[in-house]
A protein has these predicted regions:
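OB-fold and OB-like single-stranded nucleic-acid-recognition modules
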Residues: 2-176
Length: 176
């Protein structure tokens, strides 16, 4: 669940159209491997899974590929499959065909005192086109919330890929 959303107009100079500064709590799903970036620097790569819960009881397991700069002598053996982990960093969304990939560039990793509950918490930044149709709705309890859509475009090889996003803002006032 993201705390806040920033909506900006489309920029041709930006490659990352949707990104989030987040803290993810989850379970390691793929063991760590040290790899080389194109420019020669090394990084640690591993996978994590986190479950996003729905009030209706339908839970969605999210797979995230994580990369973190490798520090010489760092023990990557502690990143074991099935271990609980908390990762802070930048989460990006990439679409290729029908598949949506979540990639995270980690700034901090913690294996100690990790919450037993899966979560994604942070701030989402969206560069794209927001719909002019903004609806103010009410919950069963009478609390107001705002619903609107937007889409982001990126070029993958010679094809354009579109990611449609539905935003829900739980505030009583409509933004100006």
């Amino acid at each position: 669940m993201c705390k806040s959303i920033t909506i900006s107009s489309t920029s041709k100079n930006k490659k990352i159209m949707i990104k989030a500064e987040v803290t993810v709590c989850g379970t390691i799903s793929r063991i760590a491997a040290v790899r080389n970036r194109k420019e020669g620097r090394q990084f640690v790569s591993f996978g994590i899974q986190t479950v996003v819960k729905d009030k209706s009881g339908i839970n969605k397991t999210i797979d995230i590929s994580v990369a973190k700069d490798y520090v010489e002598g760092e023990d990557t053996g502690v990143i074991r499959q099935g271990t609980r982990i908390e990762v802070k960093g930048i989460l990006t969304f990439r679409k290729k065909g029908e598949a949506l990939y979540l990639n995270m560039e980690a700034s901090d990793i913690s294996l100690e005192n990790v919450s037993g509950e899966d979560s994604i918490v942070g701030n989402l930044h969206f560069l794209g086109k927001a719909s002019k149709n903004v609806e103010v709705k009410s919950t069963k309890k009478g609390d107001s919330f705002i619903v609107f859509s937007g889409f982001s475009t990126s070029k993958e090889d010679e094809n354009f890929e579109y990611i449609w996003v539905r935003f829900v803002q739980f505030e009583t006032e409509r933004p100006g």
